[in-house]
Structure formats: C-alpha cells, structure tokens
C-alpha cells in the first residue's frame, strides 16, 4: 500500500516509524523547506514513553530529556497546596519525562531518514487540497520553488497540525475555531537547577494567571546549567494561532509580583527568558468523524486540544500506533481508517473536553475560591481548604481518563502529599519506598479510558 503522510511534526514522523514497523514505506510531505529544532518544552507522559520505547528510541530519548520526579502545586502567593510523584516514582510502568519539542522532533526525523531513507520526506511541499476516487487519492502540492505537482497515493494520513488543510476540506463547516480569551506565553530560561532538578511546578490563581515550570535539558549545550521551560496563561486580545509567534515578558511579569517560593525567583525566571512565544488557546469543536474515504486525520489535525498536561503530542503517539496496526490488519484503507476512528475518536474527544475545563489544574482555582484569594495564615491550613483525599480523587480520575499504565501490583492512580511533611530523604519530596509500596489488594483499579 502506497501511503502518504502530510506533516513532519512529531505526530507525522512517529506515524511513519509505526508504519515502517508494519512493513510500509510511507512518503511524508512537509511545508517547511528545512526542519529545525524549534519550539519549547513538552511533558511526555507515562503512556507516551511506552510508545517511544516500542519504536526503539527510549535510550536516545532519555539522553536528551529530564526525568520527572515530583509535581508540586502552589497558590498565587507561592504557598504549596498539593504534590504528587510522577511516572515510575508513583508506581507507573514508565517514566514521565520533560524534553524540548524541537529536539524530540529532530530525533524522530533522523530516525525516519535512517530507517526509511532521506527520500521518504519531501520538504518544501505544501498540500493545497486532495481528490479521491475508488482507486486512490490525488494530492495537489505547491512547492517552495513555485512548481505545482499532483501525486497519487492509495491512502493519506493528515498530520498537518492545528491549521490542518485537510481538516478544513473534510469539515468546512467546522473550519473556524473560537478564541477562548486566554493566551499562552511559552518561554525557556537557562539557569542553575532548582529544587532537585526533576520537579514540575504549577503556580498561581487561574482567575488571574497560571504558570507551569519544568526543566527540559540538563547541562544544556555543555553550559553546566539547566534549560527550564515555563508556560504562563493570561487574558489577551486574540492573536494568530501559530506556535512560532514571538511575545514579550513585560505583559506577564506583573501577575507574579506576589509569588514567593523559597527556591525559585519566578519573576527573574521570566525576565531571563531566552525567547517567548505566544499561542492563543483556540477551541476546536470535537469532530464526528476523522475519516473521508481513503483520507484520515491524526494528532492535532484530528483532535486539537488545549496544550495542557502534555496530552496533545502523547495522544498523537497513540494515534500513530493504532492507525498503523489497522492498516496492517485491513487491505482496504477505508476499512482500516474506520477501525482506527472507532478505537480512538471517542476517548480522545473526552480528553479534549477535559482539557478545556482545566483538567487537574482546577485544584488551584478551587483553593483560590475557597480562600477568597487570600494567602494561608499557616501552610498546614491547606488541609482544611483542600483535603488530600479530595485532591487524590480528582487526580486519580484524570490519570484514568488519559490511560496512564500502572506497574503490576499497583492498584491506585494517585497518592498526594505535602513536601514539608517529608521525613526519609533530605531534599526529596517524600520517601519513594512509601509511594511505591503496593496498595491493599481490595483497592479498586480504575479502567483506562483508552
């Protein structure tokens, strides 16, 4: 089967690698004339690591990424409200890891070239539209040198991102997205490691502004320092839906004047940014089908979601595996695509809607509302505002929703703590032995939404 993939982002590239595992030799068409390691950080969840391992790139990925150990939440004053372990440190099968999106993309790019050949990726070729009949699909290409070309394939997988040309042709009635009123400011800062060098921080009152901070590279470019990724959400006039739109820190610094975290100067972190990118939170309505005959959508083209929680890229990894498996199982691409759609669309749409509602980040809003936006008189007062048991239930529901795979013998999805109550290991959030101890046999195991 002669398969085309539109888009050489992480989703399109890993799809090519999954297809190669099934015996296919796809061709990728990419608009840009040269792939470069652009962008900022991404949070690769446990289930995403599993997919990377299955394509044989886990060790290389580990070398370029940072293991996530702790996830800690703070109110608008820098007071801790909740913490949990991450990945294998919580009892999951794989790590959760932080990485620069561009470096991840380049790892996949090099691997595609190695396994499929350099001719497998056609750069500088924009897909303008498609036509199809009972025998195949015709893609109409516009090359950077001004040439127009039409190419023929048996099947087409569109992984052409949030501004997907294929999605607009397939669903013209849903082509206009809706701006949420919120813009993400995404930056990276080179600095000394904070805390243990393996912690993701969630800071702020979402009614004012939210901030996420995590390391994405140790000893960056031999500097001995850590490259730290940060993301700020704030209200702003609508801007272009483009990952590479540059912004300024001056618009967001005032939001964090009251934040006081003993191991991190948040305002200095923002001010020292190497670059800042703007990205508006755009609402794309969930689709009723990803399939049009021999053409199918994948990744952001199929299920663009608010980029919270690291699920956008990781869900594309799952898409890639399932679509490759179905194409290997069915000689008719339309039948294969329908089976893929049936397996993936409904559960992913649930995640899309959950991310639209803040996901687990809602706990910071809950605390802000319950305290009426005031600081806690004492850090221990947080248990009366947000009991650990209540937060644990919320986080467990989220982990089930996205399908985090538990390690054998572990039957719970979340066990929160407060870092100041740590006893066993100085400088660590909590004893890993306590976190990794198997749960009682009678504890119910949540079923994966996937």
Spans of features found by a protein language model:
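Conserved mid-domain beta->alpha element of the FAD-binding
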Residues: 6-23, 29, 157-158, 185, ...
């Amino acid at each position: 089967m002669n398969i085309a993939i539109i888009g050489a982002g992480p989703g399109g590239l890993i799809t090519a690698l999954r297809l190669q595992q099934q015996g296919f030799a796809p061709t990728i068409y990419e608009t840009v004339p040269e792939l470069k390691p652009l962008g900022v950080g991404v949070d690769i969840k446990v289930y995403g690591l599993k997919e990377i391992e299955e394509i044989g790139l886990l060790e290389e990925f580990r070398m370029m990424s940072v293991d996530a150990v702790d996830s800690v939440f703070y109110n608008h004053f820098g007071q801790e409200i909740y913490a949990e372990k991450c990945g294998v440190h919580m009892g999951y099968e794989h790590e959760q890891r932080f990485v620069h999106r561009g470096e991840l993309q380049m790892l996949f790019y090099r691997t595609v070239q190695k396994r499929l050949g350099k001719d497998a990726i056609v750069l500088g070729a924009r897909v303008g539209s498609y036509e199809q009949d009972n025998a195949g699909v015709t893609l109409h290409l516009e090359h950077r040198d001004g040439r127009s070309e039409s190419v023929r394939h048996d099947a087409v997988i569109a992984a052409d991102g949030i501004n997907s040309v294929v999605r607009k042709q397939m669903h013209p009635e849903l082509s206009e997205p809706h701006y949420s009123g919120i813009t993400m400011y995404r930056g990276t800062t080179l600095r000394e490691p904070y805390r243990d060098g393996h912690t993701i921080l969630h800071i702020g009152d979402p009614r004012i502004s939210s901030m996420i901070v995590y390391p994405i590279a140790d000893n960056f470019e031999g500097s001995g320092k850590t490259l730290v990724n940060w993301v700020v959400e704030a209200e702003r006039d609508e801007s272009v839906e483009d990952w590479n739109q540059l912004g300024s820190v001056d618009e967001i610094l005032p939001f964090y004047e009251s934040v006081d975290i003993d191991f991190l100067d948040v305002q200095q972190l923002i001010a020292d940014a190497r670059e800042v990118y703007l990205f508006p939170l755009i609402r794309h309505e969930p689709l009723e089908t990803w399939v049009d005959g021999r053409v199918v959508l994948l990744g952001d083209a199929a299920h663009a979601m608010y980029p919270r929680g690291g699920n956008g890229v990781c869900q594309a990894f799952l898409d890639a595996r399932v679509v490759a498996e179905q194409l290997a199982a069915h000689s008719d691409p339309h039948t294969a695509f329908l089976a893929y759609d049936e397996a993936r669309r409904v559960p992913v749409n649930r995640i899309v809607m959950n991310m639209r509602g803040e996901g687990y980040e809602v706990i910071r809003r809950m605390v802000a509302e319950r305290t009426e936006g005031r600081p806690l008189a004492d850090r221990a007062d947080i248990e009366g505002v947000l009991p650990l048991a209540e937060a644990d239930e919320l986080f467990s529901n989220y982990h089930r929703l996205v399908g985090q795979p538990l390690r054998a013998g572990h039957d719970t999805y979340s066990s929160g703590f407060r870092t100041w109550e740590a006893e066993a290991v100085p400088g660590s959030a909590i004893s890993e032995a306590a976190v990794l101890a198997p749960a009682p046999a009678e504890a119910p195991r949540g079923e994966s939404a996937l």
